[in-house]
């Protein structure tokens, strides 16, 4: 194990999929209740390196790199990255791990993917923890934007495929500056942590591991209607914990329609799930689980260790 290995890490995993492999890292007890950890857009499994050592170690935590991220294989040429394909990755991973029921811990984009898996396979999920992320992204009044996202996604992929440019080589300083400029919520320490897994050394510097076809998260996400959101929430069969950072994703939504859509979703979860839904606000920014993991660790630990059974929602 390298000197940069995360505290408590017990193994690196490589799970076979038709286009190559999904990489993951594991902590805790193999005999413990399983928890699948899902990272944010263009992040990787190392985003949980500082949080998981603070959680109960009698659980088994597996943090996967989504396809095209971290150490996971890129999708085959011509195959797009869509929300449904990321959801199917989860199904493949848990099948390889032989998990029949497990909990999900998802940050940002990982929470959206985990939420969609939760609603698609409700019988498989014991608990869902959303780290500064909505369960879904709802359609806003700006419907034209949705078409713009879809068009931009297609054009970007075609442009990348046509260019066939070799990977750009950077110094660590250059990559860190780029990363922090586009992610103001990241500290330098957290940025370096992500780059350790998100880059590969070559003779003249570092190259990014991520698939260049990945650009904007909006291009890969399916926006859903309020009716589908409410219907999906009614199908949930487990407890849900939503942790909101004071200066995080929800706070950054400037558009009134976006804020109103988020309020609708949270209110629907509160009224439908009742005691099955827990909403907690903590100090910090969108990456609080990395920069200040102590602010969320005890909340997540208590939620995971709660053993009361939930009635099935019919």
Curated annotation (Swiss-Prot):
Annotated SUPFAM superfamilies: alpha/beta-Hydrolases
Keyword Cytoplasm on entry: yes
Role summary: Probable serine hydrolase. May be related to cell muscle hypertrophy.
Molecular functions per Gene Ontology: hydrolase activity
Enzyme Commission designation: 3.1.-.-
Active site residues of this protein: 108
Species this chain originates from: Homo sapiens
Family assignment from sequence similarity: Belongs to the AB hydrolase superfamily.
Additional free-text comment from the UniProt record: This gene may have been partially duplicated (see SERHL).
Location in or out of the cell: Cytoplasm, Perinuclear region; Peroxisome
PANTHER family: MONOACYLGLYCEROL LIPASE, SERINE HYDROLASE-LIKE PROTEIN DDB_G0286239
Domain AB hydrolase-1: residue ranges: 33-293
Annotated protein name in UniProt: Serine hydrolase-like protein 2
InterPro entries per UniProt: AB_hydrolase_1, AB_hydrolase_fold, AB_hydrolase_sf
Main subcellular location of this protein, as a coarse class: cytoplasm
Superkingdom to which the source organism belongs: Eukaryota
Group of enzyme by EC: hydrolase
Gene Ontology annotations for the cellular component aspect, listed alphabetically: perinuclear region of cytoplasm; peroxisome
């Amino acid at each position: 194990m390298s000197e940069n290995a995360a505290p408590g890490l017990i193994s690196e995993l490589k799970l076979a999929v038709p286009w190559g492999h999904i990489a993951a890292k594991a902590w805790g007890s193999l005999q413990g209740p399983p928890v699948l950890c899902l990272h944010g857009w263009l992040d990787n499994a190392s985003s949980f390196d500082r949080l998981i050592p603070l959680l109960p170690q009698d659980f088994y935590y597996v943090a996967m790199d989504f396809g095209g991220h971290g150490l996971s294989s890129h999708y085959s040429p011509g195959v797009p990255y869509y929300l449904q394909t990321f959801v199917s990755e989860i199904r493949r991973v848990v099948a390889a791990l032989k998990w029949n029921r497990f909990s999900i811990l998802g940050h940002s984009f990982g929470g959206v993917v985990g939420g969609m898996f939760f609603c698609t396979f409700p019988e498989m999920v014991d608990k869902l923890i959303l780290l500064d992320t909505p369960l879904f992204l709802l359609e806003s009044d700006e419907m034209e934007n949705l078409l713009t996202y879809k068009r931009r996604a297609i054009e970007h992929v075609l442009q990348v495929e046509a260019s066939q440019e070799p990977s750009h080589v950077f110094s660590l300083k250059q990559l860190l500056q780029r990363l922090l400029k586009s992610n103001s919520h990241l500290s330098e320490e957290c940025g370096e942590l992500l780059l350790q897994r998100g880059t590969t050394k070559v003779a003249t510097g570092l190259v990014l591991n991520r698939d260049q076809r990945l650009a904007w998260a909006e291009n890969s996400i399916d926006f859903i209607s309020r009716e589908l959101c409410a219907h999906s929430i009614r199908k949930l069969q487990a407890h849900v914990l939503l942790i909101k950072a004071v200066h995080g994703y929800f706070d950054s939504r400037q558009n009134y329609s976006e804020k109103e859509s988020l309020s609708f979703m949270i209110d629907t979860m509160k009224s439908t799930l009742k005691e099955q839904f827990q909403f907690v606000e903590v100090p910090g920014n969108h990456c609080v689980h990395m920069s200040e993991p102590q602010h969320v660790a005890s909340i997540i630990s208590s939620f995971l260790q709660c053993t009361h059974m939930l009635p099935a929602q019919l």
